[in-house]
């Protein structure tokens, strides 16, 4: 499944965003290469942003030189082949793939910050997993236990990992009796709620515009459900005795949620930005007086993905998915664009 144009009005209007074509099979070119037969590829809103052209400055500042591109950065499957330097992996091993192929030697990699390391990001700047097979690196592979199937966990590799990292940051300072707000109970938010429930004893408040998403949030362990109808800031202040929440995790990042999210963050609290789409407008004097922290979140580390897989293996985190055939990628992308997916969509070759 490839995208040939980005930011094309015709492409976006017609909603025939990607093409289903035959391409050569990936091959081993490095000793550390691993070819994975895809068992599931998560459909992410970032894929829509790639099609819309939002990621073009980050993918390829010079133009469309990287196109056509195979999308897909949330991938899991089975080992198909390995390079001569790879040890501990064999054909047929079920695996999940960390999305960033970092080189392992730059300063970010040495510090364990895999997502900031030098390298490539399949699905964004090189061919990804909307395909039958994908070439990655031994560094990116995590073996799956028998309890987890590739198609069930593929979206964890980015969506789940991003949600886990943000929630993990919050749980480091959340104490029993404190409050954590989750804005958006969709594909990422419903994972974060479960991570928070598994890792801390704070009260979890979830905000969403959708009754269906709020119902899912309740199933995932939220203590309080708030409809986003314009009065959500007042509702949060009422629930927190007028103080606001110690942590706010914003999985939307647009349509006014940044302003509201900061307004419902307690003084000295932390506002975690995960979703994106608008600018954060805040007077600097307000940050000085309230000492609120604004914290960005990008994917997560290889080690954090192993931690998330442990939670999934123990049944503490469960991913709600909807499956589509690989050839129906346009339908999956359209359903995501129109808000018809509960949880995450997964493409099955």
Language-model segments: which ranges?
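Rossmann-fold dehydrogenase core element
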Residues: 270-272, 282-322
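Glycine-rich cofactor phosphate-binding loops and adjacent beta1-alpha1 units
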Residues: 171-176, 214-293
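Single conserved hydrophobic/aromatic residue that forms the stacking wall/gate
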Residues: 1-7, 12
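NAD(P)H dinucleotide-binding glycine-rich loop of Rossmann-like/cofactor-binding domains
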Residues: 62-68, 73, 103-183
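Mid-domain Rossmann-like dinucleotide-binding core that forms the NAD(H)/NADP(H) cofactor-binding site
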Residues: 139-141, 146-230, 235
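Glycine-rich beta-strand-centered segment in the early N-terminal region that forms part
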Residues: 26-41, 56-107, 140, 145-148
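C-terminal hydrophobic helical "lid"/dimerization subdomain
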Residues: 259-263, 302-349
